[in-house]
Amino acid sequence: MAEALPEAGRYFCHSCTAEIIPRLPEYTCPRCDSGFIEELPETRNSENNSSNNSGTDQNRPSFENLESAQFTLPSGYGQVTFGIFNEGLDFPIFGTSGPVEEPRDGESRREHQSRQRYGARQPRARLSTRRAAGRNEGVPTLEGIIQQLVNGIIAPTAMSNLGVGPWGVLHSNPMDYAWGANGLDTIITQLLNQFENTGPPPADTEKIQALPTIQITEEHVGSGLECPVCKEDYTVGESVRQLPCNHLFHNDCIIPWLEQHDTCPVCRKSLSGQNTATNPPGLTEMTFSSSSTSSSSSTSPTDENNAANNS
């Protein structure tokens, strides 16, 4: 009894890397005439698969005819179209892997691996405007992330509406991240700006004008005094301003500071007169004043009593 020719099934040519119908009875590739082909098992129930495919094909994007992807901008900006990436840059569809299939009845391990490798191939898209069937709702797609970034750059006020679209959500506002080479510098600048005008209030104009002006003497120069602001040494006969804490400053150095802060740049004491009787460290043995009466006021009560008894 003559043996009937087997029916040509689904085969995969490793030379052409494509699914083919082999040339019988040689079982060779009709394209390259190579015999390096592998049989792909048929599906268990073709009828069920045909009905399922008819329902899922409506939700599956056509990747072969996809030329561009349009993203809707905020109100008043229209739409923007992103072109196709390079052929070598393709992205798998998020969430289409599904659960791992178990080997079917009567199927060898090699046939199962072959079916997993070639029979269950999924299309790979460069950009898609439709949601793939069975995708996890919590996984954002590439076009969804681009859409949110476009919205955040053009209309930051519309970022409160993120998460209500069909593309999934990011974990937070994209504008809260450091984007680009200058992103970190921008964040540091914003943090530093938050500390502006958080110190003491400006000093009163009357108190600033009432600060005494004294002349630098050889005693000052010999002690190595310098302006704490500009770090320049004082010269004999130079006019400087003296704060209640006895610290000396150039007039052009201390006035702009006091117009913004009611404190001494060195000891942080205010001009209100609090704790101004105590000289700061380093000036305890040296008292600078604008009048000659300060030397007489330093006489102790004990010396006065001794002078009275001697008389």
Curated annotation (Swiss-Prot):
GO molecular function, a single term: ubiquitin protein ligase activity
Q: Which PROSITE patterns match?
A: ZF_RING_2
Q: Which regions are flagged for Basic and acidic residues bias?
A: 101-114
Decide whether keyword Cytoplasm is in the record. yes
Q: Pathway involvement?
A: Protein modification; protein ubiquitination
* Keywords assigned by UniProt, alphabetized: Cytoplasm, Metal-binding, Nucleus, Transferase, Ubl conjugation pathway, Zinc, Zinc-finger
Please give the SMART domains that the UniProt record associates with this protein. RING
Q: Where is the composition biased (Polar residues)?
A: 301-311
Q: What is the top-level taxon of the source organism?
A: Eukaryota
Q: Which residues cross the membrane?
A: none
Q: Where are the zinc fingers (C4-type)?
A: 13-32
Main location, first listed in the record:
cytoplasm
The residues that the entry says bind Zn(2+) are: C13, C16, C29, C32
Show the ranges annotated as biased composition (Low complexity).
289-300
Chain intervals annotated as zinc finger (RING-type):
227-268
Keyword hit for Membrane = no
Q: Which catalytic reaction applies to this protein? A: S-ubiquitinyl-[E2 ubiquitin-conjugating enzyme]-L-cysteine + [acceptor protein]-L-lysine = [E2 ubiquitin-conjugating enzyme]-L-cysteine + N(6)-ubiquitinyl-[acceptor protein]-L-lysine
- In residue numbers, the region (Disordered) covers 42-62, 95-133, 274-311
Q: Where in the cell is it found?
A: Cytoplasm; Nucleus
Q: Cite the record's Basic residues compositional bias ranges.
A: 123-133
Q: Which GO terms describe its cellular component?
A: cytoplasm; nucleus
Function comment: E3 ubiquitin-protein ligase that mediates ubiquitination oF target proteins. Depending on the associated E2 ligase, mediates 'Lys-27'-, 'Lys-29'-, 'Lys-48'- and/or 'Lys-63'-linked polyubiquitination of substrates. Part of a BAG6-dependent quality control process ensuring that proteins of the secretory pathway that are mislocalized to the cytosol are degraded by the proteasome. Probably acts by providing the ubiquitin ligase activity associated with the BAG6 complex and be responsible for ubiquitination of the hydrophobic mislocalized proteins and their targeting to the proteasome.
Please report the name of this protein according to its UniProt entry: E3 ubiquitin-protein ligase RNF126
* Lineage per the UniProt record: Eukaryota, Metazoa, Chordata, Craniata, Vertebrata
Q: Which gene encodes it?
A: rnf126
